[in-house]
């Protein structure tokens, strides 16, 4: 680089520093120097002109509006959410048991511009009627002649028809539709009670009151503005599809104009709504109150009775109806709940299963004691009196003769068998298969309520326990292992002596074997290995096949009615005692009572 005039080049670290400014020909022009503005960059810092008000008031007004809008939105979040008590009936909300869903609606508008804000505002405008409740502007009953007129086109404009209908319902009746009903998701679930809210049915409102009477036992109808509310108790259970079909044809409306759900049957507040509403001047009712409304709103002497459960009444019912199994007791007693106050109290108890188990145990104890107290004559007389219908004893006589047996001999053996004569209390029916041995024996055991033993359980030492709980027993299809067991262990029992019977969960019992009926394909008296049983078992052979009619029905009717006629006809020949002679001078015997109620208590 060329050296400049009047400057000295420096070496070393000071090379970067310019010691003298370079001259420029542009700065030599005097006119341009004087024309140039000599003010500094901060010369306009002070403004000495007159003051002007400007738009400060408008700015302040905008700020106040924004602050007020923000406070208003906070109040909306607090008081106008779906959880607000102001939207519900205060008395109903205080005892409501239904869960409230959280509000997912966004109350603060986004401070942004563009398409998304427009879409959000449009969505808020559509759901505005659902969000804001009507406080002071309720229309009058019966036809909507009040100051507020519900917009019929809102249902068409709304994207959520059900939500709009529920909003209209709440505006009209003051209570939410879901507060009065429970939800059925399936259209096929049947129910006798239905709550129906119909929109815009003024033309056929009066006629529906009369038309529904042929379908319902109870009708509750009230119309406010454009909403008509029905509580219907149908004579037969109906599903939602059937209810909609009936109401659309009767009211001439579309299905979109109807809300239908079953009522809450165990909700006191809902029951009070229907009860108090039925007493209003604008409500039409037909029929008596349903039971679920009457029980929750009408007080009576049944209320105090239903609060306590009497276990002895349950035991007495099971004893009188011969229910021994726990399942039969539970199901049968539950069906009595609508009519029996004690059954209602049992259903409301937390220990239902405990009571059922104890009831079954007590009934078995009572029945076992009753059976042991009876003689064989009393037992047969009691059992045949429980048989309904009539039969003919000749069917049994003809069948015995068909098998080639002398009926007089058979009758004598049956007499010793029923009286448990020693070494005559075991009767064997043997023969080839398909001769009716089991059918004949089972029919006798069934009518006398005997017990059946199965040798398949012989590995258990308790397989003979049913002999202690019956008046007659059957051991069907005895084979060689069973004959060997009887020859080894049961000789004393077949002799009619007292034996020790091992029972589960109990000490061994001292009993005599009841009459024991056997069926087998083996002729015991031809087997030399069992010669010690020959004198203890009386046998009859059934050699002929069991006859059948062309329609595949038995030729001989071995039914309960036939055995009933058989014992009644041959009562004297079997030497069964007269039941009048067994009483005290012919006096009537009082029925067994196991309940705690006094005999002189008023009904």
Swiss-Prot record:
Enzyme class: isomerase
Organism domain of life: Viruses
Keywords: ATP-binding, DNA replication, DNA-binding, Early protein, Helicase, Host nucleus, Hydrolase, Isomerase, Isopeptide bond, Nucleotide-binding, Phosphoprotein, Ubl conjugation
Binding residue positions for ATP: 431-438
Assigned EC number: 5.6.2.4
Catalyzed chemical reaction(s): Couples ATP hydrolysis with the unwinding of duplex DNA by translocating in the 3'-5' direction; ATP + H2O = ADP + phosphate + H(+)
GO biological process, one term: DNA replication
Statement: the UniProt record of this protein carries the keyword Ubl conjugation: yes
Pfam short name (any one): PPV_E1_N
Domain (SF3 helicase) ranges: 405-555
InterPro entries: Helicase_SF3_DNA-vir (IPR014015), P-loop_NTPase (IPR027417), PPV_DNA_helicase_E1_C (IPR001177), PPV_DNA_helicase_E1_N (IPR014000), PPV_E1_DBD (IPR046832), PPV_E1_DBD_sf (IPR046935), Rep_E1_papillomaV (IPR016393), Znf_lg_T-Ag_D1_dom_sf (IPR037102)
Locations listed in the record: Host nucleus
Keyword Metal-binding: no
Protein name as catalogued: Replication protein E1
